Amino acid sequence: MADEKNQQAAAPAAANAGTVTLERVSNPPAQTWNRLRANDITLTVPSISRKGDVHFALPQLFSKIECGMGQKVTDWVCSQAADSRYVEVPRGTRREEPIVVSVSADEGQVADTGVMVREGASATIVVAASGQGQAGTCASLLRVVAEARSHVTIVEVLGVAEGQQHLESLGVSAADDARVEVRQYALGGGTLALGSAIDLAGDRARADLTCRYHARRKDVLDINHVVRQRGRNTRAEVSESGALDDAARKTLRATIDLVHGARGSKGNEAESVLVLGDDVVNKTMPVILCDEDDVAGNHGATIGSVSPEQIDYLMDRGLSRREAEQLFVRAIFEDAIMHAPEEASHRAAVLRAEEVLGADVAHDFDGGAGLPEGGEAAC
């Protein structure tokens, strides 16, 4: 279809671009003390003039969707993307091939994508971000409308090189009886900033969001998750888990907002953090907002290291302490590689696993030979 053609082009070289600072983006609905420095992130990103370009804009409906990194990032992506891409999944159909958004920090690619999943339809959307160079920024803005009784699966596999950064902003609006599944794999790099906002606007809508992450050395990982439960009898399940090594810095803001009128709704959020480095900085801000009586909301976070008993058990079987700890990191990458639904996301996970774990280990669980070919790619 014409409206599904690849509209994205690589950005000009960084040498031809200026920069702009996005101040205090990826804010949560309710903030904590500023002195904790957990409310937002400030990013310096390329700024390329698109003056004179003819730009295809998404339908106006998409501009009303809240996105996880906020309006400043949305405006920046729209100004930097060579074009916007619109995909529509017809009513009552099941789209077999995934809708793929693939961006590279090496090429400075920025993607603006809108997906309309019509009533009773189902689709899988994949975002893959990768990079192997010394510097560069890539970004993806994905906005999804899930109509009544639709089923949307979103898989994000994100990993760039140490001197690079990636911005990932997601916004989803779900109508009556719609189901949204989001699986995120944040596999590290210089700076990874991702925000997700899911609006359960319809009755009995459901969202399941799972995020697995790894950061090491001096990586910066910033995550903002927001689920707004507006319809009656909605369900939200949010789960984050990961490992932090060396001097990595991670901030997570996770908010479940039980809006007035969301009677009978339930929301749960939980995070588990494994700390492997002495200089790790971990900040977690789980929040439940409630403006309705007949609702249930739960949240929590646990942080710890590998127990001495587990270390002793593994060392008795011939592993060093470091090798024993790396088993937990390996499990994150194995999950990402094994569950990548197509070639671009699989490649992004393998490239990052090779960098972190080594090529031999990365390919121990590389089952990519049977992957379907690409789908509707965006690069």
PLM feature segments, named:
Residues 1-80:
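Long, low-complexity, mixed-charge
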Residues 63-319, 333, 337-379:
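Conserved beta-strand/loop scaffold segments within soluble protein domains that form the structured core
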